[in-house]
Amino acid sequence: MSGGAGPDGGRILTTSPGEIAEQKAILRGHMREIRAEAAARDPDAAIRLAARFPARLFERYGPVVAGTVAIRDELDAAPLLARLEGLGARIVLPRIETDGAMTFRDPAGAPLEKGPLGLAQPSGEAEIVRPNLVLAPLLAFDLRGRRLGYGKGYYDQAIARLRATGRVFYLGLAYAQQQVDAVPIAPHDLLLDWVETPRGSIPLFLGRAVGR
């Protein structure tokens, strides 16, 4: 049995897969409210994040960057993607395939389709491209690099496949308010290398990506 502090200061006990799933569900509900409040209070957050994003990360881990199209109150990656494209990045976007796997495809200016969870994604005819740098939305993160998503495992599975064939830098985009003491984690959950917020950069075990 192991544990850590939750967002309310309580203990997070990780004793079984069922309990971990329950803890994640509770935390998701709480963090949806936190993120919605942060987004409402700071409508210019995405612009500030893009302006202060460290170009050295792209220079080291580019040139192919997997972005995302924001849904609901996610931190909008569009201003950052525009800046990176200006620096020479090739931008690809995630697509959820019919088998549930996430691939990354070059939209090449074509209209996006509606995918699972309301995600705007490239068509199945778009070229699949392997990214070097993956930007991921999230609900919560901690300083160990743990990420709380929506529970489908799309990013964990995609990053695992990418890391099996070479280096990839896994970067979360978040409001600073989305940081918690400890995110419940299951064996298949992968750790972030970095989190970028409108307030600053948070390196997380950078050496994991450097070694790949």
List where the protein language model places each region:
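Short glycine-rich anion-binding loops that position phosphate/pyrophosphate groups of nucleotides
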Residues: 71-73, 139-143
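N-terminal active-site beta-alpha-beta segment that forms phosphate/nucleotide-binding
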Residues: 2-130
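Surface-exposed, charge/polar-rich loops and edge strands
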Residues: 2-22, 26, 33-40, 125-134, ...
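Short linear sequence motifs
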Residues: 97, 147-148
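Glycine-rich, N-terminal phosphate-binding loop of Rossmann-like dinucleotide-binding domains
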Residues: 69, 138, 199
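A structured binding-face within diverse protein domains that lines the active/interaction site
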Residues: 121, 137-140
